[in-house]
């Protein structure tokens, strides 16, 4: 059987050929952990440090296609030292969350967007694509096994990390003939335990996160390691993250590992503008980014707001700040949802970003965070953004 998937990747497209059996959730095998753990107190949950009792693994080979999905006790992987993931970075991942709702159910937030992006990442580095809905079903079954470990309370959730790695043996560089797709989950607490905490950024042009024709719009592990050193260098100068600039124009692209938004005031028209960089192949197609844009276009008054995806520069930000036209700025991502910004270091000066009096965020930042949280925790229904995967009743 030959499974064909045609995926658009930036300015070009790849038709992937996933030979053999398709991914099939009905073939799931479950081996339960004989030593189930008890939920940890919420105050002990640190991002990505606590894991649930089970994991999902699905092998793939070019000859056989997708193998039997297996939910089994969380544990180590056994790989050959020559596996291509170790030598040539055949690796990609996703990040999404599941939430307890007032109806005592557990829902995943927009999993279809994550699966679509994961398939794009896989196709770009010649790893196998898969049937998105089947992986969503399997992830739901994994969550159901450990539903007692999904934390309760505003700001608490279950972080889900689907990962795919090339496992082919040998040191030759080429298309992997074997791969492993696995999913692990981690109970997590609020990114900001005591409410918002605005961050200081260093505008960075000496290092480049992504470039045209590259893979900056894909969620590959290889995109992240090179960004740590510039972050450490910024930290020595008192900044928490890098504001990534690109090109001679110093276009603003992303912040740290997040998409970034700015709010400007047009003093001539009196309208406010929410702006973020366009998806030109250098920007990660963030699910939270898309959620912010969709909600802003749906809920903000178009007579008072313009919502734009356009190029803008650090010079524009600095100039408009001096003119009193910079109103607020924030990053967006799965971990924090929104992360308010208070200062940006550039040319040996700090650009000050306004915050609400006595608070650590701007007005729109606060509103966006509430909109998204209400949907994630089941207080508000919005489209098909929440998918129920377990019932606790």
Swiss-Prot record:
InterPro entries cross-referenced by the UniProt entry: Aminotrans_IV, Aminotrans_IV_CS, Aminotransferase-like, B_amino_transII, BCAT-like_C, BCAT-like_N, BCAT_family
Organelle targeting sequence: 1-16
CDD domains in alphabetical order: BCAT_beta_family
Sequence positions bearing Phosphothreonine: 315
EC number: 2.6.1.42
Biotechnology: Isobutanol and other branched-chain higher alcohols (BCHAs) are promising advanced biofuels derived from the degradation of branched-chain amino acids (BCAAs). Degradation of BCAAs begins with transamination reactions, catalyzed by branched-chain amino acid transaminases (BCATs).
Modified residues (N6-(pyridoxal phosphate)lysine): 219
KW Transferase (keyword) present: yes
Keyword Zinc assigned: no
Comment field (misc): Present with 87300 molecules/cell in log phase SD medium.
Name of this chain's protein: Branched-chain-amino-acid aminotransferase, mitochondrial
Origin species: Saccharomyces cerevisiae (strain ATCC 204508 / S288c) (Baker's yeast)
Lineage: Eukaryota, Fungi, Dikarya, Ascomycota, Saccharomycotina
């Amino acid at each position: 059987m030959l499974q064909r998937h045609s995926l658009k990747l930036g300015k070009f497209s790849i038709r992937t050929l996933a030979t053999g059996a398709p991914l099939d959730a009905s073939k799931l095998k479950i081996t339960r952990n004989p030593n189930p753990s008890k939920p940890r107190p919420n105050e002990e949950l640190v991002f990505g440090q606590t894991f649930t009792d089970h994991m999902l693994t699905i092998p793939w080979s070019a000859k056989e296609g997708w193998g039997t999905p297996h939910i089994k006790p969380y544990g180590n992987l056994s790989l050959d030292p020559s596996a291509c993931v170790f030598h040539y970075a055949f690796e990609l991942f996703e990040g999404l969350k599941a939430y307890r709702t007032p109806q005592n159910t557990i829902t995943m937030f927009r999993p279809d967007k994550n699966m679509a992006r994961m398939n794009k990442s896989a196709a770009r580095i010649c790893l196998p694509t898969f049937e998105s809905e089947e992986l969503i079903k399997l992830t739901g079954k994994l969550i159901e096994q450990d539903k007692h470990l999904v934390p309760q309370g505003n700001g608490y959730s279950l972080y889900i990390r689907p990962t795919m790695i090339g496992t082919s043996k040998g040191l030759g560089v080429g298309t992997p003939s074997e791969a492993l797709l696995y999913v692990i989950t981690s109970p997590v607490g609020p990114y900001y335990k005591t409410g918002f905490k605005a961050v200081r950024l260093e505008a960075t042009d000496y290092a480049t996160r992504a470039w045209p024709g590259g893979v900056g719009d894909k969620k590959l592990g290889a995109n992240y390691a090179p960004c740590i050193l510039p972050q450490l260098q910024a930290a020595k100068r008192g900044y928490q993250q890098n504001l990534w600039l690109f090109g001679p124009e110093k276009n603003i692209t992303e912040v740290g590992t997040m998409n970034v938004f700015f709010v400007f005031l047009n003093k001539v028209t009196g309208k406010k503008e929410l702006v973020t960089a366009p998806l030109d192949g250098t920007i990660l197609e963030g699910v939270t980014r898309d959620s912010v844009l969709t909600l802003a276009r749906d809920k903000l008054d178009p007579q008072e707001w313009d919502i734009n995806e356009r190029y803008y520069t650090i010079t524009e930000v600095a100039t408009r700040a001096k003119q009193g036209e910079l109103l607020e700025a924030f990053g967006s991502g799965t971990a924090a949802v929104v992360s308010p910004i208070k200062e940006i270091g550039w040319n040996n000066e700090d650009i000050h970003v306004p915050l609400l009096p006595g608070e650590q965020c701007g007005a729109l930042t606060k509103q966006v965070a509430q909109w998204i949280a209400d949907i994630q925790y089941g207080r508000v229904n919005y489209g098909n953004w929440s998918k129920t995967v377990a019932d606790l009743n």
